[in-house]
Swiss-Prot record:
Protein's gene: qutE
Stated name of the protein: Catabolic 3-dehydroquinase
Family: Belongs to the type-II 3-dehydroquinase family.
HAMAP family with a match to the protein in the record: AroQ
Free-text function comment from the UniProt entry: Is involved in the catabolism of quinate. Allows the utilization of quinate as carbon source via the beta-ketoadipate pathway.
Keywords: Lyase, Quinate metabolism
Length: 154
């Protein structure tokens, strides 16, 4: 059985997880989240690999999304962070590669400042998860595994 790939993308300031506003985002670091997700994914299925990428630069995230089109990525889990609220370029990149994606936010963006309520990605995402803390990443990965089993890549 061929290996499927899920790409986990994290946007600006998420490299500061564990120390940045822990009352909102918790104390888990991005490295610990990635490691935990990888372990969890291995327990679900040996046939899916987790790829990870984080950048504070919009263009770097867009380049990585474009790369996903040719590197065998089957699904994307993305926490676009602040880019959620204004990045048409990120939206266009995600829709342009035709890879299903899940939008994740650690906090409940709808309980926060008004400017955080608008997402340029949500209407294009297969699913949107917010407010579950870092568990939201696990839920997104699990959804992707189920989706990939139901809809194999042609």
């Amino acid at each position: 059985m061929p290996i499927k790939k899920i790409l986990l993308l994290n946007g600006p300031n998420l490299n500061l997880l564990g120390t940045r506003e822990p009352h909102i985002y918790g104390y888990d670091t991005l490295a610990s989240i990635e490691s935990s997700l990888s372990t969890y994914l291995s327990s679900l299925t040996p046939s899916v690999e987790l790829l990870t990428f984080q950048s504070n630069w919009e263009g770097a995230l867009i380049d990585r999304i474009h790369e996903a089109r040719t590197d065998g990525t089957d699904a994307i889990v993305i926490n676009p962070a602040a880019f959620t609220h204004y990045s048409v370029a990120l939206r266009d990149a995600l829709t342009g590669v035709d890879i299903p994606f899940v939008e994740v936010h650690i906090s409940n963006v709808h309980k926060r400042e008004e400017f955080r309520h608008k997402s340029f990605l949500s209407d294009k995402a297969e699913a949107v998860i917010c407010g579950l803390g870092v568990f939201g990443y696990r839920a997104a990965v699990e959804w992707c595994v189920g989706y990939l089993k139901e809809r194999p890549k042609l």
